[in-house]
Amino acid sequence: MEAPASAQTPHPHEPISFGIDQILNSPDQDSAPAPRGPDGASYLGGPPGGRPGAAYPSLPASFAGLGAPFEDAGSYSVNLSLAPAGVIRVPAHRPLPGAVPPPLPSALPAMPSVPTVSSLGGLNFPWMESSRRFVKDRFTAAAALTPFTVTRRIGHPYQNRTPPKRKKPRTSFSRVQICELEKRFHRQKYLASAERAALAKSLKMTDAQVKTWFQNRRTKWRRQTAEEREAERQQASRLMLQLQHDAFQKSLNDSIQPDPLCLHNSSLFALQNLQPWEEDSSKVPAVTSLV
């Protein structure tokens, strides 16, 4: 008879040192203890109405290693305190050094439906082949031109321009060669191919040098001729203006010969001697009566 009675009697809970009733020193208040796990560790987020010995559902096999460090290291130390206003204060929890789970490469099963970057790299399409070939050719051409590229200077924007190409050195001729070329040019402005070759051979020059020299000399001759003609035209224009001015001044300074007919008529004589450009009218000679 005593065995069934003892079986029906619930097992008393173990005293908890951090229970709310012990913190408040009020054993009369009914407070449910925090749920505990199978190994006696309490859980902070346990159900409020759960049984003391109830445990959370076990993790699947793939997640078994994820919770092992936490179970081995024990539970967090929970210290619940009730403020005078009735608010439960939960301090910040710091996990133990051994409670941080190590990285598990095989803990989560890979999802075959989601393609990864490595799997996309193995795919080949016709347009991808042409793009790769084009990029490869461009990189090859850039690598081939790298040794010949000119480095740009750092400084003012106008100084960052690529320097111009180096010009070829100017060919210098001797005085004897220049003298012979000038003599031939004064006699003949244009040379035939055979004449040019013979002249180049006699002066120990190349055919291209003789041809280039004659082209430059003709250009210089045309420019000089145009300048000389312009100077002659301006000189002739100045000479004509000077002659016109002298003739006009001579016509003004020459005295007017009186007409014999006007000598016997005072009115006609006065009109003949009238000079409107004269400012001083006193210079007009007086009319004398010849009657």
UniProtKB/Swiss-Prot annotation:
GO terms for cellular component: nucleoplasm; nucleus. Its main location: nucleus. GO terms for biological process: central nervous system development; GABAergic neuron differentiation; negative regulation of neuron differentiation; neuron differentiation; neuron fate specification; neuron migration; regulation of respiratory gaseous exchange by nervous system process; respiratory gaseous exchange by respiratory system. SUPFAM superfamilies: Homeodomain-like. Pfam families: Homeodomain. Residues 166-225 bind DNA. This is T-cell leukemia homeobox protein 3. Transmembrane segments: none annotated. The gene is Tlx3. It comes from the Eukaryota. Keywords: Developmental protein, DNA-binding, Homeobox, Nucleus. It is found in: Nucleus.
